[in-house]
């Protein structure tokens, strides 16, 4: 079982007198910066000119270029998309790191897969809230918190663990609990969850169910409701109380169908396929492929995205959602 740390375990905040640079001011960046500031930390924001720069300024932060922020800071938290981090790190952060500084991440991908190679004289750790930035900020403001993970990759000063816990405490995570892990474990489990279950697994399952009903002659609108729309109702029940809460809340007919039919859909062969996905994450195959795809301009990424957006389930869904004004996407769908 994971070791969990709480507020009572952070007896000395070793970062309170340090300057923290938050690199990026998106979902996580704004939450980290504001929570740390509210907890008395000296925070600056590092950005390139644009809307985020203006927003951080409006929120009362001193905003600098990434290089300037890194040069001023003792602690540099990189909250940029994975694929942008290596270039920004090499060009703007690495030249400004000093011995004893802390290089911090919210995801271990680039360090674990050697895309970012920190010098030996800095501490390297991650603090990863297990929720989106808006929730990290809102729960903090309400006096609560989102749990987080932390891991130490490199302890140059001898107090990297204390620094990581102080940072986690600064964003409020110790109120809920901070679980200790490693860069390897955080990275590999995060990627596996996305690919086999949360994104890849779920979308494939939803499309397969939709196609099965439509191919059997059922109206696509009903197939959409049964295989996609109602998924939120079930996931919310699991989110709130696990599988047992979902099974308790649905009808007995639905629960019996779960028991007798679920294992026929997700079979031992499915688990073997999941094992193959995990193996490709562990040996770096997935990372190498994604890095190469990004460097090539993402031709397969964009082609697949365009094709998927034309699937019948998407066409039907767009029409049905016009009937439900209470269903609104949190973000505007567009080209990445």
From Swiss-Prot:
Enzyme Commission number(s) of this protein: 1.1.1.86
UniProt-annotated binding residues for Mg(2+) 2: 190, 226, 230
Cofactor, how bound (note): Binds 2 magnesium ions per subunit.
Lineage per the UniProt record: Bacteria, Bacillati, Bacillota, Bacilli, Bacillales
Residues that bind substrate: 251
Gene: ilvC1
SUPFAM superfamilies from the UniProt entry: 6-phosphogluconate dehydrogenase C-terminal domain-like (SSF48179), NAD(P)-binding Rossmann-fold domains (SSF51735)
Biological processes annotated in GO: isoleucine biosynthetic process; L-valine biosynthetic process
GO molecular function: ketol-acid reductoisomerase activity; magnesium ion binding; NADP binding
Binding site for Mg(2+) 1: 190, 194
One GO cellular component term noted in the UniProt record for this chain: cytosol
UniProt entry keywords in alphabetical sequence: Amino-acid biosynthesis, Branched-chain amino acid biosynthesis, Magnesium, Metal-binding, NADP, Oxidoreductase
Stated family: Belongs to the ketol-acid reductoisomerase family.
Pathway membership, UniProt: Amino-acid biosynthesis; L-isoleucine biosynthesis; L-isoleucine from 2-oxobutanoate: step 2/4; Amino-acid biosynthesis; L-valine biosynthesis; L-valine from pyruvate: step 2/4
The keyword Amino-acid biosynthesis appears for this protein: yes
Active-site residue numbers: 107
Named cofactor requirement(s): Mg(2+)
Protein name: Ketol-acid reductoisomerase (NADP(+)) 1
Alphabetized InterPro entries for the sequence: 6-PGluconate_DH-like_C_sf, KARI, KARI_C, KARI_N, KARI_prok, NAD(P)-bd_dom_sf
Function comment: Involved in the biosynthesis of branched-chain amino acids (BCAA). Catalyzes an alkyl-migration followed by a ketol-acid reduction of (S)-2-acetolactate (S2AL) to yield (R)-2,3-dihydroxy-isovalerate. In the isomerase reaction, S2AL is rearranged via a Mg-dependent methyl migration to produce 3-hydroxy-3-methyl-2-ketobutyrate (HMKB). In the reductase reaction, this 2-ketoacid undergoes a metal-dependent reduction by NADPH to yield (R)-2,3-dihydroxy-isovalerate.
Domain KARI C-terminal knotted: 182-327
Catalytic activity: (2R)-2,3-dihydroxy-3-methylbutanoate + NADP(+) = (2S)-2-acetolactate + NADPH + H(+); (2R,3R)-2,3-dihydroxy-3-methylpentanoate + NADP(+) = (S)-2-ethyl-2-hydroxy-3-oxobutanoate + NADPH + H(+)
Record-listed NADP(+) binding positions: 25-28, 48, 52, 82-85, 133
